[in-house]
Amino acid sequence: MKRLTLTCALACAAVLAAVVAPALSARSYRPDPVQFSMPASGERALLGNASARGEGVVSKPLRAAKRFNVVGLIWRSGPAEPGIALRTRREGGDWSRWRTVYRHAEDGPDPRTGEPPVRGTASPLWAGEADWVQYRSTTRLPGLRLHFVNVRGTATASERAISALRRGANAGVLAVAGSLAPEAAGAQAGKPAMVSRKDWGASKCQPRDTPSYGQVKAAFVHHTVNANDYSRAEAPDVVLAICLFHRNTNGWDDIGYNFLVDRFGTIYEGRAGGADSEVIGAQAVGYNAQSTGIANLGTHTTVRQTPAAIRAVARIISWKLPLHGAPTSGPVTLVSTGGASNRYPAGRS
């Protein structure tokens, strides 16, 4: 009996070791992302002015096939800037408030770069941990589908159990590694500290193609039109989810932004190719080859960005522009390369 008990204990230990093995690293554990989509369904007329015009719709509550962290919309065609809002909830929980998402047709690759132009897509919304979603729109959107991303290893009950074990094991390894690690080498002079692509999990979102390079004359600052209540621990997951949405839903080569900043003032390296290089992003149609793009994680049309994040954006600009011989103040002339959403035709400055 003792031998049988010992054998069972050893077998259980072996299974447990195999389960946690992927997390036994001195880097933060990142589970494999899960992505899936579903067609929109159960629309009914939206009450109010849009309903009076026969245009607005609201969906029934939709149960996703798996738990998700991010949801976005994609459709075939429609108005340049439809009014769209989403709300989500976890199984057994309360609905979030309705949150507006935007198409932002002006955010995307330059023409003739090989990356597809912006089509009918709404900004991906960070939902935390959610199982249900509902949308409403001021107009019907043909071919509408919902795209979901889970980057936290919580898509199913079994994945949630495995991820909990792996995160626990990883936390122990990180604690030991932190106490033994030598002091980090000094950064490049003037370069702000930032989370590398490797550390926010870009290995799960590999670029489709090699980077292209242009010339940095100016900086475009955006917000990602996302939730503002993400935690410090969730922020790298938000960056990874945006990368996956840009790459796999929009069809771009990589994440569109060159840099991202969270509400805590942490800076993240964006598109691959080198933070100190003039990498062409996908943040301002017609001007990407002449600029760098910085995105604030959150929605800041009604909620102000935090002082820490504003200072982080300033640190990027005050380092990045002089690095490439561009002034940080005063007028700058950019020449448009065109694009369907660009008000200036190609060749106009």
Which residue stretches match the model-derived regions?
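Extracellular structured ligand-interaction cores
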Residues: 68-70, 81-83, 130-132, 143, ...
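Long, well-ordered alpha-helical scaffolding segments within enzyme catalytic domains
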Residues: 65-66, 81-82, 91, 231-250, ...
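Secretory targeting and sorting signals
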Residues: 1-25
